[in-house]
Amino acid sequence: MLTSLRALPRAACRLSSINLFHGRSRQNYATEAKIPINIMEVGPRDGLQNEKGVIPVDVKVELIEKLGLAGCQLIEAGSFVSPKWVPQMAGTGEIISRMHRLPDVHYGVLVPNQKGLEGLLSVLNSYNASPDSDSTPPPSDEISIFTAATDAFTRANLNTSINESLAKLAPVAKQALDKGLRVRGYVSVAIVCPYTGQVDYKKVREVAKELLNMGCYEISLGDTVGRGTPTQVAEMLEEVKKELPVERLAGHFHDTFGTAVANVFTALEHGVRTIDSSVGGLGGCPYSPGATGNVATEDVLYALKNSKYTVIGTEYGKGTIDLDKMTEIGWWISEKLGRESISRAGRALRAKKIRDAEMVADGEVRAKL
């Protein structure tokens, strides 16, 4: 069972930078150093934003805390967007203020515009004025900004063109950087647009470069519709890498057509070292008709077992992200939402756990006969 985060002592230190390490693989990679990769857990934000029912603040807080205890060190905790348009993200300020924050975890929030940034800064100002500011990590140390690779998608999502969205984001990024925040960028519909079809990868490269020039430390390239294939992912990345360092890129894949895990491996083989994923496969996009959830964190973790890659995590996951704990969390949050986890690995691991428990119980009964 997951330990209660409330029982843990508060660490008297600030958030540390990401600590990459080299582990040793087994089996086929017994003599080679593993390649470290990061997972950005987007379940609390991208995973929940498209849910129809009301999700209590307490549940969101508990979700983020559980993820930290499972070893996640990169967590997108919410977004400062209009509750009129994305009601599930209401209360993000309260959530990041209330949650027990671990010192070696980065808690990011998405801000779509200047107003969103002002909402976050208000929370941070309250934190800085509190007596706990010297002994507890801040509510957030990172923002994400986003645009897309087609005008049709930005007009549906932001009611603006790509160029107009970039012009509005530039001062947001600058102010955030001036305040000491890290800035991450998203490029949606990097492969297929739900409104215009196949995307021009040169446009993906151009938009990603603009975000990089704004000061984004990393650009997440999204297969928002989930229609991308490994071949398309490879072609897109090769185009973007012509002008952007691959170490500044991340992959964000939805699993609409069941290709997300394959796309993750393609991205890794092309040098990408950060993958966005969502516990329980939560997710979708309100402006992308037909899109299903993000690639499940459990599926990524399971697929990477015995590979040449190692996922970086915190001490709570023993230096990685604990697959068993993530499976528990995936089922817990899915049940809170009134459904089963859609993670394939999560379903299989839970079924195995139930079977094993039944076999133990059956053995105990037979022993008493």
What do the PLM-derived regions correspond to, one by one?
Residues 2-369:
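Catalytic cores and adjacent flexible loops of soluble metabolic enzymes
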